[in-house]
Amino acid sequence: FTAALSVDALEHAGLIVGSGPVLVTGATGGVGSVAVGMLAARGYEVVASTGKAASSDWLKSIGASDVIMRDETSAESPKPLERERWAGSVDCVGGSTLAYVLRTLNYGASVAASGLTGGNGLATTVLPFILRGVNLLGIDSVQTPIAIRRAMWTRIATDLRPSWLDT
């Protein structure tokens, strides 16, 4: 459900298929792995980030086009902005990983943040927001109104359904 809310929020913020790679952090976790499958089902190019190198083949089997290691996405940087890499992101980790995502999002891109396994702090500057117009979308699945829940469950059963659920 949280993965569906994340994908839906990104699409409402302007993410479209063909706009570039979408990063999913914490991709071997529950929300992350389902987000990989949902994004792939919609036709997005998905890059999965994980700390588990042994899970690379599995992540590709559920829809990731590429897999990168967690140390690349959690590295702290003195730079407030880095090379633009991502058309969007589902961040299930938080902390330094979310800071990395914000400084590497494409102009106008968004990150849907739902996790805090990497910590609840956020060491960043306003520069990604005011120079690149990026958006930080908070995802709360606990208090989601029933009308939105129904809409998400419908999407989960249709266009967001990961293909690997059928195997």
Indicate residue ranges for each PLM-predicted region.
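Short alpha-helical
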Residues: 1, 30, 53-54, 96, ...
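Short internal alpha-helix immediately C-terminal to a glycine-rich phosphate-binding loop
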Residues: 1-41
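Short, flexible, glycine-rich and Lys/Arg-enriched loop motifs at helix boundaries
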Residues: 13-19, 71-86, 143-144, 165
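Residues at the starts of beta-strands that form the adenosine-phosphate
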Residues: 21, 44-46, 110, 135
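Alpha-helical segments flanking ligand/cofactor-binding loops in enzyme cores
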Residues: 36-37, 57, 99, 127
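Adenosine-nucleotide cofactor-binding segment
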Residues: 40-96
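Glycine-rich phosphate-binding loop and adjacent beta-alpha segment
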Residues: 96-164
